Swiss-Prot record:
This is 4-hydroxythreonine-4-phosphate dehydrogenase. The gene is pdxA. It holds the Pfam family PdxA. It comes from Vibrio vulnificus (strain YJ016). Its cofactor is Zn(2+); Mg(2+); Co(2+). It is found in: Cytoplasm. GO terms for molecular function: 4-hydroxythreonine-4-phosphate dehydrogenase activity; cobalt ion binding; magnesium ion binding; NAD binding; zinc ion binding. Catalyzes the NAD(P)-dependent oxidation of 4-(phosphooxy)-L-threonine (HTP) into 2-amino-3-oxo-4-(phosphooxy)butyric acid which spontaneously decarboxylates to form 3-amino-2-oxopropyl phosphate (AHAP). Homodimer. Belongs to the PdxA family. InterPro entries: PdxA (IPR037510), PdxA_fam (IPR005255).
Length: 328
């Protein structure tokens, strides 16, 4: 059965529109609907020398596979002109409107998944909206109390206990309650969305050497280890850890792990991006819909040049399609 996926082009001055237009050259097995300003896409296509037919989205028609050389567009009006590579605060609210339209469409089953292009947090905040990222935006919009940020590339999945908070706040944020909820969501979605019957989750410690018996910090002793033991006993989830972050990423562990759970953003993401930059995908777990995204930013210096690497966007789209097809 043909499904309908919605794609947000992201920050209009960045490479998001370039990526969407580049992939319009190809055939895809499901319908792709792009939430963006149609005129902006037409202008960028001309700038890039891409010959594409922009079609108006009609929700009343049945979805059909994406045909090469075409792009179905749900037009969201952009209030100000856009120059590739130049941020414009007047378009900050426009970006959020594209995200809102896509998410609400998924929540009412109009769309089967969201694939998001990169946004610029700074320009949205300067437009007067407190915005810390897609993950938090979709969680609030869908009234989801807690979501899990996971990134994946070939041979490695990493998830986070905390996301976009200052490093100084991480220790207090890693509570037994939060850790248990994060593991519940991660385990459930590995089973339900990734079709892994008995997931093996490997858990990082917070401190160097996982605290080294309390000499380098007591979070492992007081919070992480007791919580993992409780979850193992009560729910039978396969958990290994806490393990030192500087040793968990070796073949001995990774060959057996379905996911690695890190305590904070820069503990695990540098490893994943080193392993698969340009070929990795951001997946939000715990939402009432499937959401994948690129693993990079807006790359303003590349916008409109035709030099943007489509690898991560392609991976995000392929992952979304795989997850949608597993639901069938």
């Amino acid at each position: 059965m043909v499904k309908r996926l919605v794609v947000t082009a992201g920050e209009p001055a960045g490479i998001g529109p370039d990526l969407v237009l580049a992939l319009s050259k190809e055939h895809w097995p499901h319908q792709l609907v792009v939430c963006a300003d149609k005129k902006m896409l037409a202008q960028r296509a001309e700038q890039l020398g891409i010959n594409v037919t922009l079609l108006d989205y009609d929700a009343s028609t049945a979805p059909s596979p994406q045909q090469a050389g075409t792009l179905v567009v749900e037009h969201i009006d952009m209030p100000s002109t856009c120059v590739a590579g130049q941020l414009n605060e007047e378009n900050g609210h426009y970006v959020l409107k594209t995200l809102e339209r896509a998410a609400l469409g998924c929540m009412k089953s109009e769309f089967d998944a969201i694939v998001t292009g990169p946004v610029h947090k700074g320009v949205i905040n300067r437009a007067g909206v407190a915005f810390s990222g897609h993950t938090e935006f979709f969680a609030e919009l869908s009234n989801t109390p807690l979501v899990v940020m996971m990134l994946a590339t070939e041979g490695l999945r990493v998830a986070l206990v905390t996301t976009h908070i200052p490093l100084a706040y991480v220790s207090k944020a890693v509570t037994a309650e939060r850790l248990q909820k994060i593991i519940d969501i991660l385990h459930r979605d590995l089973v339900e969305k990734f079709a892994i019957a008995e997931p093996k989750i490997y858990v990082c410690g917070l401190n160097p050497h996982a605290g080294e018996d309390g000499c380098l910090g007591r979070e492992e002793i007081e919070t992480i280890t007791p919580t993992l033991e409780k979850i193992r006993q009560e729910k039978g989830i396969h958990l290994l850890g806490p393990l030192p972050a500087d040793t968990i990423f070796n073949e001995k562990y990774l060959n057996d792990a379905d996911a690695v759970l890190g305590m904070y953003h820069d503990q695990v993401l540098p490893v994943l991006k080193y392993k698969g930059f340009g070929q990795s995908v951001n997946i939000t777990l715990g939402l009432p819909f499937i959401r994948t995204s690129v693993d990079h930013g807006t790359a303003l210096d590349l916008a409109g040049t035709g030099q943007a690497n489509t690898g991560s966007f392609r991976t995000a789209l392929q992952h979304a399609i795989e997850l949608v097809e597993k639901k069938q």
